[in-house]
Amino acid sequence: MGYVRLKQLIEQNAWREAGRELGQYMNGEWDDELAVLAATVFSALGDWEGAYTCIAQGLQYNYRNYELYLLLGNYYERKNCNQAWLCYENALYYCSDEDDRRIIQQHKERVQQDDRWCVHKVSIVILTYNLKDMNMQCIGSIRDTCDPSSYELVVVDNASTDGTL
């Protein structure tokens, strides 16, 4: 969908009018683009829970939309700098636009200045016993959806006989 009028209102910072324009889409079919626009309007109007609902809906539609992770980071920045930083990290992971990457990186660096910031790598442990194909899918999914610098992967084999390791 185009959402041309809604985009124009957002660019003009006409938030109340954008909220009214958004009303015509609220009961229709959603996509991640509409979720980004709606979350932007809700957050500009100070309705952070409404923004969160739109972001969650958009991520269900497309979990690779970096703009939704950026908005989610903005939502969490008021509550938990670690969650915000992780959202910005996901935004960077999925973003290919260099200008947007710089902006996201600035958000990430700003959050890191918070004294409460403390994010460590995650250890993902996979216990295996045969089921080579399932294990490969699991590992592939982790590699497709997680920044390689954010985790370590530990595979523990329980004497597989199908060539799993």
Place the predicted regions along the sequence by residue.
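N-proximal low-complexity "stem/linker" segments adjacent to membrane-targeting elements
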Residues: 85-144
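TPR alpha-solenoid repeat register
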Residues: 34-35, 68, 100-104
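Short coil turns that delineate tetratricopeptide repeat
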Residues: 29-30, 63, 96
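Canonical positions in the second alpha-helix
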Residues: 24-25, 57-58, 90-91
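Residue-level recognition of tetratricopeptide repeat
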Residues: 7, 40, 74-77
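A conserved acidic beta->alpha catalytic loop
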Residues: 157-165
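Structural motif corresponding to the intra-repeat A-B loop/turn of tetratricopeptide repeats
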Residues: 12, 45, 78-79
